[in-house]
């Protein structure tokens, strides 16, 4: 039985992954299943699939991993389908909040799934309530689908344009009616969305590995501000705004941590970007050591880059238990320590007596770095110098990532030297913002969002959401 979890590891969390297909020669429910399975890393709380055969639409949803929700695949026939995996950044982790959501419009049923986070949800929700709408979830996704369902515009493309006039924030959306499938990406391009081609149909997905999972070919990224419509006539593209109308806000954390290393996103190979981050770390801070190790799995590729640049051998020092159950973890230091020990265990022969350069991708709350360092010390490490392949996280994200309130972010309150002392490392270095931008070499720095590091948000965010450092207690 799936239970809501208190996330015990010190990482930010992506909100979700989306997938959709239009193909008369394939079973949509099977292809969507494989697609969202390939996106499981983007959300583990719930999963859902909507399928239509052109006449009847049906949605199947549940709490848990894709394999838990769909132990037996539905027998629903259909050539159009969308799917979703979720980690909740807005809305509670309850069955009502599982996506896709389905609604009735004047043109018939529609279903929608969303990756991202709106910054004007409350205002839109109030306005819809005044117009007589009722809500059964606490998600911004329900606001989106109700705005679409209420639209009186004559075409779906015009309905999406009207929607994009209303909503602000991050969104990569897939939707379907009984006749077509749609996708759109916000004008800043915060969240990823790609277009793929099967032999006889078309696919939309958050990341390219979902295309690989069903043997679809990558065609291109959906552009920021683009609306795509897919039906029996093929693919049509409509731009809500010119792609160069303003600077974009592509999320840098996709490249640091969220995306699968085998993804290609906005023209950038994720694996290469992470190798570059490791090499940049060595350029900025040439720690001496006997071995380079990673905190698995998120630090693996950057550690390989650091080892290659430095000439210090890379060895596995921490073994990750890939079969650990999704157990509810109560807050508290002892239980947090137990959770980390369940997940990671030192390989003593590679640790004992060694001067270790340890590579991880980020420190957010600072709750587990000290536990990991203590594990290595207890296994006999002589020295532990920690390198982080991103800058200090000092500001919250409002665009689809759960990075906690500002008062919970350790780097917002303490200096690097203080954090180093608190976690028990012998030295600590964060990758510079410039080094990070140079590592993501296929995208211009001005087209990326680094707000969680520098506090410069691409668009207006609620003032009270920035958090006061005065109310730390």
Model-flagged regions — what are they?
Residues 162, 210, 217, 225-226, ...:
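Phosphate/diphosphate-binding loops
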Residues 1-224, 229-289, 295, 383:
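Conserved short alpha-helical segments that host acidic/polar catalytic motifs at enzyme active sites
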Residues 113, 176, 184-185, 196, ...:
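Generic beta-strand/beta-sheet core signal
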Residues 133, 154, 284-290, 308-315, ...:
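Secondary-structure transition/capping motifs at alpha-helix termini
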Residues 164, 179-180, 215-221, 374-473:
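PRPP-dependent phosphoribosyltransferase catalytic core
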Residues 28, 89-90, 120, 190-191, ...:
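Flexible loop/turn segments at secondary-structure boundaries
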Residues 311-357, 367, 394-401:
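Short, glycine/charge-rich flexible loops or terminal/linker lids adjacent to PRPP-binding catalytic cores
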Residues 137, 142, 314-325, 422-440:
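A conserved beta-strand->alpha-helix junction
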